[in-house]
Amino acid sequence: MIDKYGRSIDYLRVSITDRCNLRCIYCMPPQGVTFKTHSSILRYEEIIKIVEVGTELGIKKVRITGGEPLVRQGVVNLIKELRKIPELEDITMTTNGVLLPKYAFALKRAGLSRVNISLDSLNPDTYKTITRRGEFSQAIEGIKAALEVGLNPVKINTVVMKGINDNELENFVNLTIDKDLHVRFIEYMPMGETSLLSGNYYVSLNEFKEIIIDKMGMVPVNIQNNGPSKDFKVPGAKGTVGFITAISHNFCSTCNRMRLTADGFLRPCLASDVEVNMRDEDGKISSEGVREKFEKALLLKPISHNFYKNDFFPKKNMSQIGG
């Protein structure tokens, strides 16, 4: 699929649930959110149909997200069924890692290519502050499980927040020296009710990037198909370090993705409230209708995101859209 700005759209992020076993401060407001009812969430067979039509239109890569995708029953079988779609080249997942010790082997066997694990602190107390309920040791065991079964490359997603974890970047870089881990520092993005805290949390990664690169002696590396990340590594290290600067230096000109929410809405841009209902008027998912909705969303994809423009923030929280 080619949008009106000449960008090739071949990547679909699929949220399968808005529920999560953590309550991260940048993903959900303190009071929590009202979760979608079971009947409003797309059934797995509906997700498969949407992906099948998407691949006919040019989708080659799917990332399974949440909420936390591993809290939804049957996710391993979903991966297995998606792997049967011949045009689908890559199936990945973003997870907080807590349940990976239980599911990593089965996910790998089902056909999952690799995982991104959200880990925002290497300090157990700070980790609990950020997640509001998580145990740091469980996340670490999840990373170990992913490495052991070969869900490679294992990427660590770290949202950098001012005054919370911005003093830990060097420690994260050190993770990549002896382990085949690929840390990606991500700028905080204001979403939904959590956007009220954006003035407290947001910090441009440009303030840290050059300092860390110089201090750690990192050199640039070119990793194919690594999305918006600008990548570096410490010479001799097993892993790499990436910087994703969605706010300070956006990558909209090369954006290749759309997002499918757990309740069946296709969003052409994360930082926009524009979305297309993939269900027909009768509430069903049809191949013809899905094709039309993809084409409609393609036309609605903006030239760039709207973060901070005229004080705009997306109305939905990240957990409701899909992380």
Swiss-Prot record:
InterPro entries for the chain: Aldolase_TIM (IPR013785), Elp3/MiaA/NifB-like_rSAM (IPR006638), MoaA (IPR013483), MoaA_NifB_PqqE_Fe-S-bd_CS (IPR000385), MoaA_twitch (IPR010505), MoCo_biosynth_MoaA/MoaC (IPR050105), rSAM (IPR007197)
The pathway to which it is assigned is: Cofactor biosynthesis; molybdopterin biosynthesis
Q: Please, one GO biological process term?
A: Mo-molybdopterin cofactor biosynthetic process
Keyword list (alphabetical) reads: 4Fe-4S, GTP-binding, Iron, Iron-sulfur, Lyase, Metal-binding, Molybdenum cofactor biosynthesis, Nucleotide-binding, S-adenosyl-L-methionine
Give the residue range of the signal peptide: none
Q: Which residues bind [4Fe-4S] cluster 2?
A: 252, 255, 269
The protein's required cofactors: [4Fe-4S] cluster
Which amino acid positions bind [4Fe-4S] cluster 1, per UniProt? Answer: 20, 24, 27
User: EC annotation?
Assistant: 4.1.99.22
The broad enzyme category this protein falls into is lyase
Write out the catalysed reaction. GTP + AH2 + S-adenosyl-L-methionine = (8S)-3',8-cyclo-7,8-dihydroguanosine 5'-triphosphate + 5'-deoxyadenosine + L-methionine + A + H(+)
UniProt cross-references to SMART domains, sorted A to Z: Elp3
Q: Which residues bind S-adenosyl-L-methionine?
A: 26, 67, 118, 189
State the Gene Ontology terms under molecular function: 4 iron, 4 sulfur cluster binding; cyclic pyranopterin monophosphate synthase activity; GTP 3',8'-cyclase activity; GTP binding; metal ion binding; S-adenosyl-L-methionine binding
Origin: domain of life? Bacteria
How, per the record, is the cofactor bound?
Answer: Binds 2 [4Fe-4S] clusters. Binds 1 [4Fe-4S] cluster coordinated with 3 cysteines and an exchangeable S-adenosyl-L-methionine and 1 [4Fe-4S] cluster coordinated with 3 cysteines and the GTP-derived substrate.
| Binding-site residues for GTP, renumbered to this chain | 13, 63, 94, 155, 257-259
How does the record describe its quaternary structure?
Answer: Monomer and homodimer.
Q: Which PANTHER family match?
A: MOLYBDENUM COFACTOR BIOSYNTHESIS PROTEIN 1, MOLYBDOPTERIN COFACTOR SYNTHESIS PROTEIN A
Q: What does this protein do?
A: Catalyzes the cyclization of GTP to (8S)-3',8-cyclo-7,8-dihydroguanosine 5'-triphosphate.
Family assignment from sequence similarity: Belongs to the radical SAM superfamily. MoaA family.
Q: What is this protein called?
A: GTP 3',8-cyclase
What's the gene?
A: moaA
